[in-house]
Every structure is written in structure tokens, then in C-alpha cells.
From Swiss-Prot:
UniProt protein name: Protein FdhE homolog
GO cellular component: cytosol
CDD domains registered for this protein in UniProt: FdhE
Keyword terms: Cytoplasm
UniProt record similarity statement: Belongs to the FdhE family.
Keyword Translocase (UniProt): no
Matching InterPro entries: FdhE-like_sf, FdhE_C, FdhE_central, FdhE_N, Formate_DH_accessory
Gene for this chain: fdhE
GO molecular function, one term: ferric iron binding
Superkingdom in the source lineage: Bacteria
């Protein structure tokens, strides 16, 4: 199964071509009113008793700055034309690798830099100064490289700040998509149907979507449904195993696939209602080390941890 977003007026006409898998919503858009505040609070909470406390606090400062930039720099767009075009082509409407960016994302980056300067330590301040002095051409090259997953072209010290601006920009655009999602037969379920990026982790929900697993996009913050007991990367079901650091009742586990040799974190709200896709993934890097020691490669990227040059 794959997911496509179509204009609302086309949904009824095309419903018979796909399947809604019962009443399961195939796609959930982020609630930007609470997303960054909740993430900040969770990062700060996890930092209280974690060997990575300093880095979790650092990430919390970035998400706090994202919340302020969201408030100070709203974005209003008419996405109807992009949605119609993407529905016809079968491509994500905000495909990060080809979508034409405006200067808005650079305004967001400038706002983040200005906010983070206040109490930044010297080594972070040096990175912020470097980005602040970068030309438009340099910044756009950095953005192109990150969005096309060519991480070697961007220093790992710069990437979290650039990505924070890009992600906020994409999340603002995604929140204004005037369409509905439908599930249909197809491929590439491992990629976000909104922007084509990859997940940071997956979350098994409680409440309205109780027991359903959604992959959380590391760019536009949308979530898309992928059934449990299936590899989110290759969709095989034969050789899946679940790993944790504590016990079978752990709220954070890693799902490994023997077919493709990858793993993805799964966060269970049933075990801990406070789990958050980015924060809990970042706070459980010891589990990543365990998985790499077992010979598995991570199939996702956390927006605060990019591969080095």
C-alpha cells in the first residue's frame, strides 16, 4: 500500500480506485500549535536523567527557537495548484528534492540564528556566525545537499540548524495542503507521501488511533500509516525482531529486519503517553549503538544527528 494526497473535489471520484483500509486515516498532519512546545518539554524532561543531557538540552533550545520563529514568521500559501499537479503525477506535493523553495526558509534560518545566539557557547556561536555570513548561494547549496541526502556536502555541525529552518518551512507548507489522503496499491511506502523524505521514527498511537503505527517524517512532521509486523523499509514480514534496553514493556524499541538489514525505532504511547518521535529517538542513542553492534543499519535520520563528512 502507498499513500497519495488528492484535492478534496477529486477524492470522491477516485475513491473506488483505492482503499481506505476501513476507517484508518492514512495520513496525519502535524498540529503546529503544540508540536514544538511539546517536543521542547519532552527533550527537557528526558535530559534530567540521561548521559546525553547536554545535547538534549541543546536540541531543546533549537525547538524552542523554532516555536518562536513559527509565531514571528507565519507563512500563507495557496497550495491548490501544487496539489493538482502532484495528484496527476503521483508525486508528493512538497517533494523536497525538487520543490522550488522561496526565501522564506532563509528568513526562518536567520530568525533561528538570532534567537540561539543569546546564550550559545563559543563553539556553537562560531557555527552560527559562519551560517550568518554565508551567501545565499552557499545556503541554497547546503539545502539542496541535505534535501537530497548528500550529507557529506554539509558539515554535521551546520546541518541541524539548516534542517531546523527547512523542516519548519516544510511543516508550515504541509499544514496548508487543501487535500485529503487516500491509500492505494503502490510502492515507496517508506517515504513520506507529503514531501518524500524519510522517517525519524515510528509511533504506535493511543486514543483515536489506538494501536495504529505511524511513521513520523523528519522534514515536514507529517505522519503516515504503515501496518505493524511489517518492515517499514522493505515491507517484508519474515524476519522481524524487536529490541529494547530495558524489558519487553519498554516504551522505546527497535524493529530490525533480517531481509534488508535495517532497523527503525518504534515508540509506544501505550507504555508512555509522553513519547515524542524526535525527542525519544534522540534520547535512546544507546539503543542505536546496540543495533549497530548487531550488524543493522539505521533506516532513518534524526534532525539533530546527521552523518558526518
Amino acid at each position: 500500500m502507498s499513500i497519495r494526497i488528492v484535492p478534496k473535489d477529486q477524492l470522491g471520484k477516485q475513491r473506488e480506485k483505492g482503499t481506505t483500509a476501513g476507517n484508518i486515516p492514512p495520513l496525519l498532519f502535524a498540529n503546529l500549535k503544540s508540536l514544538y512546545t511539546r517536543r521542547t518539554e519532552r527533550l527537557q524532561q528526558l535530559a534530567l536523567d540521561n548521559p546525553l543531557a547536554d545535547y538534549l538540552d541543546f536540541a531543546a533550545k533549537i525547538t524552542e527557537a523554532q516555536q518562536k520563529a513559527l509565531h514571528d514568521h507565519p507563512l500563507v500559501l495557496d497550495m491548490q495548484a501544487e496539489l493538482v499537479q502532484s495528484a496527476a503525477s503521483g508525486k508528493p506535493p512538497l517533494d523536497g528534492s525538487v520543490f522550488p523553495r522561496t526565501e522564506h526558509w532563509r528568513k526562518l534560518l536567520s530568525a533561528l540564528i538570532a534567537e540561539l545566539r543569546h546564550d550559545a557557547p563559543d563553539h556553537i556561536l562560531a557555527v552560527l556566525d559562519n551560517l550568518d555570513k554565508a551567501s545565499v548561494h552557499e545556503l541554497e547549496l547546503y539545502a539542496d545537499a541535505l534535501l537530497n541526502r548528500d550529507f557529506s556536502q554539509v558539515g554535521s555541525e551546520k546541518a541541524p540548524f539548516i534542517w531546523a529552518a527547512l523542516s519548519l518551512y516544510w511543516a508550515q507548507m504541509a499544514s496548508q495542503i487543501p487535500g485529503k489522503a487516500r491509500a492505494e496499491y503502490g510502492e515507496h511506502r517508506q517515504f513520506c507521501p507529503v514531501c518524500g523524505s524519510i522517517p525519524v521514527s515510528s509511533v504506535v498511537h493511543i486514543g483515536t488511533h489506538n494501536g495504529l503505527r505511524y511513521l513520523h517524517c523528519n522534514l515536514c512532521e507529517s505522519e503516515w500509516h504503515v501496518v505493524r509486523i511489517k518492515c517499514s523499509n522493505c515491507e517484508q514480514t519474515r524476519d522481524l525482531n524487536y529490541w529494547s534496553l530495558d524489558s519487553e514493556l519498554a516504551a522505546v524499541k527497535a524493529e530490525s529486519c533480517g531481509d534488508c538489514g535495517t532497523y527503525l525505532k518504534i515508540l509506544y504511547q501505550e507504555k508512555d503517553p509522553q513519547v515524542e518521535a524526535v525527542a525519544d529517538d534522540l534520547a535512546s542513542l544507546i539503543l542505536d549503538a546496540k543495533m549497530e553492534g548487531e550488524g543493522f543499519a539505521r533506516s532513518s535520520i534524526n534532525p539533530f544527528l546527521f552523518p558526518g563528512e
